Design a protein with these regions (language model features):
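Short, flexible helix-loop junctions that flank or precede catalytic/ligand sites
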Residues: 1-391
């Protein structure tokens, strides 16, 4: 609870319990636990989550709150029987998320200011844009989509513009101040399209749909943008801004309609931050700086993860700040693909990530690699970590 762990995985076999901890997106093996103590621990977790401790085969989900001093986290638990025993995954989520804005995630002003233009923030130069389709994305499996989604919506003027979100029953992705949530599904007995049609009567300024996958919902949003000058913000899992746009294009709505409503696509990947206490400077080779596009006159040194002297291994205690990992926390790497005539034409004729990315870079988009190189030059991350994050 006191560290940066986001998930813990338990694999129960007949004799023991294997455990893994995810810290800053990387899985670490933990000491093996004997089955007897593991069973007692699991019974406590299931009881706290209001699950059946005796049931070891049927899938169960629940959550509980854990508190350690001033740290309070919501623990979402999922258990499922396996041929050899049981697998249990617990996800940790801070009750009060310290990351409230895109700036908190590491989004630089050049990208943030452009994104704010599309999401309805007043501009000193040019008209304020209050219509269009905005896509927010991040990789799947812990890539940060929920976090960047909330932070992206927080960039909007939610006091001047009225937003309403649509989510399946049981989902609460859009927990953002001043955005009301309308649920639909079997539990509520409501269907998505009638729910949207009813919300339209309120005449909101914008619609919000996380992890969109239903072509009918996307079609309804596009129609609202075209006929009523509304704004729509959706999210998908994707590795790049261009891939996110291609995924939305592949949902089945006519390409001409997507081309007419599309505004921008914001994508984030997460890179681990070097520990500020133990990171080590080194002199980069001039050829490396040239490959990175960094002027040698401005960048004299880069930083890397702490490399202990082999002769001192085991003698020096690990860094108290990062517990010897060399990294502490994560930072977002961003890219923003903005609409232009070439992008519109590509949506209609060649809706694929490679084409979108090529056009965007030719039009001046700051690519995720370029954003990462800035973080590298500032000593925020390492060359090896940047390569891993962009792979």
């Amino acid at each position: 609870l006191s560290g940066e762990a986001s998930r813990i995985l338990f694999d129960y076999s007949a004799q023991a319990v294997a455990m893994q901890l995810e810290v800053d997106g990387m899985w670490e093996n933990m000491p093996i636990m004997d089955r007897q103590n593991g069973d007692m621990m699991l019974a406590v977790f299931k009881t706290l989550a209001h699950l059946d401790p005796v049931e070891r085969q049927i899938r169960q989900t629940g959550e509980f709150t854990a508190k350690l001093e001033q740290i309070e986290k919501v623990c979402s638990m999922e258990s499922q029987g396996t041929p050899t025993g049981e697998r249990v995954l617990i996800k940790f989520r801070a009750k009060k998320d310290p990351l409230k804005s895109l700036s908190d995630l590491g989004c630089r002003d050049i990208t943030l200011n452009s994104f704010k233009k599309w999401i309805g923030i007043y501009q000193e130069e040019g008209p304020t844009i209050t219509k269009g389709l905005i896509i927010v994305s991040a990789p799947e499996n812990g890539g940060g989509l929920s976090t960047v989604w909330r932070c992206a919506l927080s960039a909007a003027d939610r006091f001047m513009l009225d937003f309403v979100a649509f989510e399946p029953d049981g989902s609460n992705e859009t927990s953002v101040e001043n955005i009301s949530i309308k649920h639909y599904g079997a539990e509520s007995g409501l269907e998505a399209i009638p729910t949207i049609e009813k919300a339209v009567l309120r005449e909101p300024d914008g619609f919000v749909v996380p992890e969109i996958s239903d072509p009918a919902i996307l079609e309804a949003l596009c129609d609202q943008i075209l006929t009523m000058d509304r704004m729509a913000v959706v999210s998908v899992n994707a590795n790049s801004a261009s891939e996110a746009l291609a995924k939305v294009c592949a949902l089945g709505v006519s390409a001409e309609k997507i081309a007419e409503v599309f505004s921008c696509s914001l994508n984030m990947r997460l890179s681990r931050r070097l520990c500020s206490t133990c990171k080590q400077p080194f002199l980069p080779h001039p050829q490396l700086l040239q490959q990175l596009g960094l002027p040698q006159t401005h960048v004299q040194e880069l930083y890397q993860q702490y490399q202990p002297n082999p002769a001192e291994m085991g003698e020096i205690p690990p860094c108290p700040q990062c517990d010897g990992r060399g990294f502490k926390g994560r930072i977002g790497l961003f890219e923003l693909l903005e609409v232009n005539d070439q992008i519109k034409q590509a949506i209609i004729s060649q809706p694929n990530p490679a084409t979108f990315h090529q056009i965007a870079e030719q039009s001046g988009m700051v690519s995720m690699r370029q954003d990462g190189v800035v973080q590298l030059a500032q000593g925020t991350t390492s060359m090896q970590e940047l390569q891993r994050a962009l792979a």
